[in-house]
Curated annotation (Swiss-Prot):
Methylates ribosomal protein L11. S-adenosyl-L-methionine binds at T160, G181, D203, N246. This is Ribosomal protein L11 methyltransferase. It is an enzyme of class 2 (transferase). It catalyses: L-lysyl-[protein] + 3 S-adenosyl-L-methionine = N(6),N(6),N(6)-trimethyl-L-lysyl-[protein] + 3 S-adenosyl-L-homocysteine + 3 H(+). InterPro entries: Ribosomal_L11_MeTrfase_PrmA, Ribosomal_PrmA_MeTrfase, SAM-dependent_MTases_sf. Its EC number is 2.1.1.-.
Amino acid sequence: MNWTELSIIINHEAVELATNILENHGSNGVVIEDSDDLINQPEDKYGEIYALKKEDYPDKGVRLKAYFNELTYDDKLRQRIKDELLNLDELDQHNVQFSEKIIAETDWENEWKNYFHPFRASKKFTIVPSWETYAKEADEELCIELDPGMAFGTGDHPTTSMCLKAIETYVLPQHSVIDVGTGSGILSIASHLIGVKRIKALDIDEMAVSVAKENFRRNHCETLIEAVPGNLLKDETEKFDIVIANILAHIIDEMIEDAYNTLNEGGYFITSGIIKEKYEGIQSHMERVGFKIISEQHDNGWVCLVGQKVSE
């Protein structure tokens, strides 16, 4: 299977909405190359900074690179994405450029490696590519070694970062965790590093399960995390203290009742993948089912909610 890299150069004001459009239409990751970074090169909020190459950035504006597999990226989807982007009020119509290139499946992982470096994803967690060597900066730093494979992001998406922050806050070593839509397995690995002994990772995609298992092996927890194909929580009979789901909003909406029923009393539902336009509906649904919303994070147009199962 081949992949299409859709490259779009746009003005800064349109970046957030354009990124949401690409992700909502199924892009397996969006790379953001901002020309301002060459000028400012600021130290990020966790103290990481890397040397930037001028040739990797547009002369002005921002280049977005989105990745679609050949099974889903057809002429209809191409035109739909273009129409939605061109209809953005924030878009400067005179300074927008579209281009595409095909990336063979065998080159996909190497393409990602050009953009994937160690980075601090939250206060405690640092994501480290499996092909790089990294020395911890502090004893309390928890490193997740990750190889995203061909169809999964690198862990730098706001929804992942927010979930990691929620795990830091609410997950304790004595808890049990079920990770729904595990993808690369990053949130299961984070739970393991917190000290959780009972973890189950589900994904409807068997390739995701395979990628997750390989990442569990890299992090020396392959025998400690149960990774299995599963259709959300529809067939789940066991109870857990924590349900984690970093998936799309409409899928979260389908599983809220099942998440509530899967949790032990007092347990937490940590969920993200929710765009800001849909989070109020998700929050209302969670509250109707019986969740008490105890945390709400916002980052770059995305929302992470934490609901606790409590008795009336």
